[in-house]
Amino acid sequence: MKAAWPLLLCIALLPEPSSSLAQSEDLATKSQRAKEFMAEGKFAEAIPLYSELNHALPNNPGLLLNLGMALHMAGDERKSIPQLEAAVKLDPKLGPAWLFLGAARLQLGDALEAVEPLRAVLRLQPDHQEARLMLAGALLSLERNAEAAQEYRKLADLSPASSPAWYGLGRSYEALSIRAFHQLEKTAPESAYWLALVAEARLRQQQFTSAFYLYRRALENSPAMLGLHEAVAEIYRQTGHPDWASVEEEKERKLSPPDCHSHTFECDFQEGHFERVIAAATEANPEESYYWRSRAYNELALNAFARLGQMPPSAEQHEIKAHIYSSQKKYIEAAEEWRQALKFSPGDRQIREQLAISLKFSQDYGGALLLFQDLLRTDPESTQLNYLVGDTLLELQRVEEATPFLRQVVARDPKSQAAHKSLARAYLAAGKSADAIPHLKAALATDEDGSLHYELGRAYQAHGQLALARQMLSQYQEIHSKQEAEKQSLNQEMQITPPDER
């Protein structure tokens, strides 16, 4: 928002009523000087002048707007909001005041409160692209993904060359696809529909063995489900078994084709009528509905991202690549894409945070820490950033420095299991097993490999609570043994084997 200030100044620097300013040559001089400061980007210098003008001429919506705008552009969002609220109260048709009010609330992370001011701008000026982009972003951050998609779609129609519009549209559709998948997972976990979606995702990530295993399980559940044999054939082709692929293709051909006269999901999907699939899926049974909606939204997302890829280089293109690399756990490559994105948007906090996270996951803890600390300086109340700084310091074995940050996070958000886990690690590293115990207990629900049960058992031992120690260590053994058995079973099952004779 702030990067676009020259454009917005053209809208927002409204002339104050000449009759008022004519009362005093001094006020007119101050007004002119304040405008010059704003045009030069010297927002802090303009603030005292606009404050004096507002004191001399109270309840002037134009002056309130300009003071609020100067405060916003100088980075003082909290002080800008009352001025902008007063301006729109006096003049509800003052579009620029609504715009800056929405922008200020977004800067403070209050997306919910930003929505109505931005909608007010669009009621006054429906083709205002900056307002629509901010509104769409606010809705997406609130997980109101269908509404966000509508706004991004309108923006893409207004400006087909807008990279942010296509990127946002793709992200909205992607979120809708994921939501439909999670609804399917709740409704029918382990169903053929669910297995097929997970397998499709693994195949896109070139995890061929895992995808093969899941497609085979889906076929066991639903042998007549269209597309499964063809997907298995694709895995065979990708892994160097063209003869096996031919067998699976023949099995697919023997299945009864869909009756396309009745507009089946399969036919509409194959013909690229994804909106029709989504609309029709609302009338289907839940399993089928969630399956087809997830697939259709995913295709719409891919189409939007493909459109983005055809445009000149942009931050959004690098963000897409960074997310893909992250999903593949290629964090060094992801970090490089975030660096490239940052060249297009040097002040973008979200990009800087994502770069730091990628650096952390790639074990460049020193580089990550510098970025996290810099972000925290401008947002010291952020629970997320305090946690990331503390956890990164812990990875660097700077335990004494890490502990205060992690304590602060746990105090603010007692339900944060990640923070409890990190704080427990810090206490254990410092030899404070008694202090670690309550935090290990709070984080036990996240223990996938038994390590937290083991650490808690050791902490109980050190603290002399031997019965509890035996209980925790016994549970650790159970978890560990079960996990090893499952791992061995999966290793046997997850092999790319020849086609069944059936």
What is each of the regions a protein language model found here?
Residues A39-E40, M73-A74, Q107-L108, S141-L142, ...:
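Register position in tetratricopeptide repeats
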